[in-house]
A protein has these predicted regions:
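Topology signature of small-to-medium multi-pass alpha-helical membrane proteins
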Residues: 2-195
Length: 195
């Protein structure tokens, strides 16, 4: 049932997107609270991941930007690194490595968010583990001063949303699982008493 390429329409891609969504998020729709926390967390993740990706892309294309615009991105980064107490070239290399490795760390966190949507308890390991790797790597390569001075207040709010949302949701999901376990244990006892 393949159509010739000249007869394809944009809406022909919709079944593919539905399949990808089902593959990532599963077939079962979670409760409203999980969807709400997931939406806020996904927004925070998307903004932080986008900012990381754009920063890495700008760093990769800094030579092209300098040729076309006459603006040296690397000089700005080197000066900023010197303000933070780094040797400028060292800071540039550290920032490049940090941004590159964070692409994979943000992917790990996304896997955790997909597991959150599916209400799998293991998702906290992916989200908190990814964030812990992110922050430890940031502090060791760029320093705590980088977090204080160069991470914007908006980004700090996004980190807060991601962490707080995950904490609240993981606490409530563990309570929900405990309640379900208690109810399943008490039901067989009631049946045996009725006999």
């Amino acid at each position: 049932m393949k159509k010739p390429i000249d007869q394809l329409k944009p809406e022909d891609a919709i079944p593919l997107f539905v399949k990808i969504k089902k593959l990532i998020l599963g077939n079962k729709k979670p409760d409203g609270f999980t969807r709400l926390i997931f939406s806020f967390s996904l927004f925070a993740w998307f903004m932080l991941m986008s900012w990381n990706s754009i920063s890495y892309f700008v760093l990769l294309t800094s030579d092209i930007i300098e040729k076309n615009k006459g603006f040296s991105v690397q000089e700005v980064i080197i000066k900023n690194g010197q303000k933070l107490g780094f040797n400028g070239e060292e800071f540039l290399a550290s920032l490049h490595g940090f941004l590159f490795h964070n692409l994979f760390i943000w992917l790990l966190i996304f896997i955790g968010l997909a597991l959150m949507y599916r209400k799998k308890r293991i998702y906290t390991l992916f989200v908190f583990g990814g964030l812990m790797i992110h922050f430890v790597y940031m502090f060791f390569t760029l320093g705590f001063q980088y977090f204080i001075e160069d991470i914007s207040f908006f980004d700090k709010i996004l980190y807060f949303i991601l962490i707080l949302g995950t904490l609240i949701h993981s606490f409530l999901i563990s309570k929900e699982k405990e309640t379900a376990l208690k109810n399943s244990v008490s039901e067989p006892n009631e049946d045996s008493e009725n006999l």
